[in-house]
């Protein structure tokens, strides 16, 4: 009989082994209740909301919005067997750090810190809209911390006309409520879905700093790069991602990308179809298991 192998499996293998448990834990109660951790690294502190236990999954929010947008989705994913980590972007919640020179590289470093301190190996990164830029750069710069990447509501490489203007109105509390709702319904919510909850939750005071942060590094440096497999979840009614651009990323990265369209969802997606998103992520992770 050969001697027992006492060497621990690599972290990517451990992720796979833990992911196998998802088939048993789907719908089961999360093993750990919701709580917060404050990670400190020199002048930086990252406020992280934690749900559940299991392989690490990091949720990254959209432009000018914070991680509390994911409350419902985080609970569903935790109940499906993940340890869900939600680092608040700098300037939101209790997350702090230098804002001068903030860019996607710095934001990705905060994600890597979260995975290093609270993960149990490389994590699944789930980025919503602007958050998917952070996830992509984290995968590029910190591949050892990233097992896979899920894109929620990733816009087309070049924004279609009108959507950025609608965002500017919808996110501005000084604008008339009727105009904001019109912008939300046009650019974020599918027909029949209630846009009113998103009148709240914006951080317009951070608009300029995050707009500047999103420009560095330029998209050309990271759009065609992926160390990890990618699930590109698109809303069927998302004006930021016209049907003609469905395979835009897959055409560049090939078989690393799986494209799936979520019905009755637009750019907001997360509050519109949390159950469909959860199901898609869990099924895709199962498919990654060798």
Say what each PLM segment does.
Residues 49-94:
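Conserved HGGG/HGGXW glycine-rich cap/lid loop of the alpha/beta-hydrolase fold
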Residues 242-251:
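Short alpha-helix in the alpha/beta-hydrolase fold that links the catalytic acid
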Residues 237-241, 267-268:
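Acidic catalytic loop of the alpha/beta-hydrolase fold
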Residues 161, 171-226:
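Conserved alpha/beta-hydrolase catalytic His-Asp/Glu region
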Residues 256-290:
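Catalytic active-site module of serine/aspartate enzymes centered on a nucleophile-bearing elbow/loop
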Residues 86-126:
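Active-site loop/oxyanion-hole signature of alpha/beta-hydrolase fold enzymes
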Residues 226, 232-234:
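Short beta-strand/loop motif that positions the catalytic acidic residue
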Residues 133-140, 149-175:
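Flexible "cap/lid" loop of the alpha/beta hydrolase fold
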């Amino acid at each position: 009989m050969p001697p027992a192998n006492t060497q621990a499996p690599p972290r990517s293998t451990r992720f796979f082994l833990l992911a196998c448990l998802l088939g048993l834990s789907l719908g089961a109660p999360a093993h750990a209740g919701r709580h917060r951790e404050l990670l400190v690294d020199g002048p930086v502190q990252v406020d992280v909301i934690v749900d559940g236990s299991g392989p690490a999954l990091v949720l990254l929010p959209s432009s000018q919005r914070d991680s509390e947008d994911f409350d419902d989705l985080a609970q569903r994913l935790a109940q499906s067997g993940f340890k869900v980590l939600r680092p608040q972007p700098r300037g939101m919640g209790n997350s702090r750090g230098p804002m001068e020179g903030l860019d996607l590289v710095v934001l990705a470093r905060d994600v890597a810190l979260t995975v290093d301190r609270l993960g149990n190996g490389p994590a699944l990164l789930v980025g919503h809209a602007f958050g998917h830029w952070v996830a992509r750069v984290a995968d590029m710069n910190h591949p050892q911390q990233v097992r896979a990447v899920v894109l929620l509501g990733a816009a087309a490489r070049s924004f279609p006309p009108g959507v950025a203007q609608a965002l500017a109105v919808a996110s501005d509390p000084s604008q008339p409520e009727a105009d904001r709702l019109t912008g939300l319904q046009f650019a974020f919510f599918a027909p029949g879905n209630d846009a009113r909850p998103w009148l709240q939750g914006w951080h317009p005071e951070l608009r300029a700093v995050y707009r500047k942060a999103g420009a560095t590094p330029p998209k050309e440096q990271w759009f065609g790069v992926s160390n990890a497999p990618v699930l590109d979840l698109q809303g069927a009614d998302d004006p930021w991602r016209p049907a003609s651009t469905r395979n835009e990323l897959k055409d560049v990265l090939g078989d690393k990308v799986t494209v799936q369209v979520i019905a009755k969802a637009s750019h907001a997606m997360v509050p519109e179809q949390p159950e469909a998103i959860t199901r898609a992520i869990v099924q895709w992770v199962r498919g990654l298991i060798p």
